[in-house]
């Protein structure tokens, strides 16, 4: 593999943003920032056999998801994703065509959001594939949807469905063997491999006077605990309100673990005032964006998340995916 041939092959033929002054081909990229906006920068790393396995992930799948998880972080701030940079540590067994396919997976998603690839780096490694993606976005000044903005009496919501990605991973790892042949296993696998960042919902939330957001990367319980801690409030959610796919309980009797702690759904969860919830709900319905009320923000007290069932209440611990546990 020739590094310069690879750089030439992945260099975009078109640029979506006129603010890009220098893209791929120099020591660094240059772009002109807009007046009146704040820049958002996020980075995530995916490591072979930690975040994905090659026997069930194609190069395109790996590239797509590596970019998607970063776009989801931009969405959780209420922002617009604009640029991305890619750093790869590639084992020698990988071919140039496989690396190009990984970039194609990223490009497939980038085109949906009119994002420009503006740089990166590629090195060889004797061990596992490592993919690091940095995304740069923007948000109107003062409009970021911070975790610290939840207040008592807010409505708590989540987009889409929760638990589907964890179910998909369990199917891929053959930890789950559905007894019911009617279960849509391909749907759950797709949700794990190809998450859909909720940029449109984040943008809707950014127009409100106040909204707290977090993306469901490590699990709903973990993300809501982060909001509760940052805002110094308690959050109460209702089990019967949680949005799940109708087939999820058919896959495993302990499906609630997937829904609450599974993670990697990359949905958005957050809080808005009661008045703004009505607006958000209507706007999402008009755009066919799934969103569900799941609870309320309670008093400013010791930060905790409570799950209410028909008969009981329990505190949801801040657990989910943790790289160091």
UniProtKB/Swiss-Prot annotation:
Pathway(s) it belongs to: Cofactor biosynthesis; thiamine diphosphate biosynthesis; thiamine diphosphate from thiamine phosphate: step 1/1
Gene that specifies this protein: thiL
Disulfide bonds: none
Residues at which Mg(2+) 2 binds: 44, 73
Organism: Bacillus subtilis (strain 168)
InterPro entries noted in UniProt: PurM-like_C_dom, PurM-like_C_sf, PurM-like_N, PurM-like_N_sf, ThiL-like
Protein name, UniProt field: Thiamine-monophosphate kinase
Enzyme Commission number, as recorded: 2.7.4.16
Note: Reaction mechanism of ThiL seems to utilize a direct, inline transfer of the gamma-phosphate of ATP to TMP rather than a phosphorylated enzyme intermediate.
GO BP field: thiamine biosynthetic process; thiamine diphosphate biosynthetic process
GO function terms (MF aspect): ATP binding; magnesium ion binding; thiamine-phosphate kinase activity
Annotated binding of substrate, by residue: 51, 264, 321
SUPFAM superfamilies in alphabetical order: PurM C-terminal domain-like, PurM N-terminal domain-like
UniProt binding sites for Mg(2+) 5: 218
Metal-binding as UniProt keyword: yes
Role noted for this protein: Catalyzes the ATP-dependent phosphorylation of thiamine-monophosphate (TMP) to form thiamine-pyrophosphate (TPP), the active form of vitamin B1.
Sequence similarity: Belongs to the thiamine-monophosphate kinase family.
Signal peptide interval: none
Domain of life: Bacteria
Keywords on record: ATP-binding, Kinase, Magnesium, Metal-binding, Nucleotide-binding, Thiamine biosynthesis, Transferase
Binding site for ATP: 103, 120-121, 147, 217
Amino acids binding Mg(2+) 1: 44, 121
Catalytic EC class: transferase
Keyword Kinase: yes
Binding annotation for Mg(2+) 4: 27, 73
One Pfam family recorded for the sequence: AIRS
Binding site for Mg(2+) 3: 27, 73, 215
Catalytic activity annotation: thiamine phosphate + ATP = thiamine diphosphate + ADP
């Amino acid at each position: 593999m020739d590094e310069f041939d690879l750089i030439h092959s992945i260099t975009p033929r078109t640029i979506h943003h006129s603010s890009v002054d220098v893209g791929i081909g120099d020591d660094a990229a240059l772009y002109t920032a807009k007046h009146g906006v704040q820049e958002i920068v996020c980075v995530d790393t995916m490591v072979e056999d930690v975040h994905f396995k090659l026997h069930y992930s194609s190069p395109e799948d790996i590239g797509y998801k590596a970019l998607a998880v970063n776009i989801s972080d931009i969405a959780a701030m209420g922002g617009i994703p604009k640029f991305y940079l890619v750093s790869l540590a590639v084992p020698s067994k990988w071919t140039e065509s496989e690396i190009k396919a990984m970039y194609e997976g990223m490009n497939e998603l980038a085109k949906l959001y009119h994002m420009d690839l503006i740089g990166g780096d590629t090195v060889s490694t004797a061990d596992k594939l490592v993919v690091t993606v940095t995304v740069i976005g923007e948000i109107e000044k003062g409009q970021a949807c911070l975790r610290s903005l939840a207040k008592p009496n807010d409505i708590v919501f989540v987009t889409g469905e929760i638990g589907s990605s964890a179910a998909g991973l369990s199917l891929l790892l053959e930890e789950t063997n559905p007894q019911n042949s009617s279960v849509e296993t391909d749907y759950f696998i797709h949700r794990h491999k190809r998450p859909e960042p909720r940029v449109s919902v984040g943008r809707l939330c950014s127009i409100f006077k106040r909204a707290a957001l977090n993306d469901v990367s490590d699990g709903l319980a973990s993300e809501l605990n982060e909001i509760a801690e940052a805002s110094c409030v308690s959050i109460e959610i209702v089990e019967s309100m949680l949005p799940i796919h109708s087939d999820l309980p058919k896959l495993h009797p302990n499906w609630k673990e997937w829904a609450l702690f599974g993670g990697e759904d990359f949905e958005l969860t957050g809080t808005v005032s009661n008045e703004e919830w009505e607006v958000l709900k209507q706007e999402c319905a008009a755009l066919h964006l799934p969103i569900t009320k799941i609870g309320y923000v309670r008093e400013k007290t010791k930060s905790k998340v409570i799950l209410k069932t028909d008969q009981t209440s329990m505190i949801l611990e801040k657990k989910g995916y943790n790289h160091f546990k």
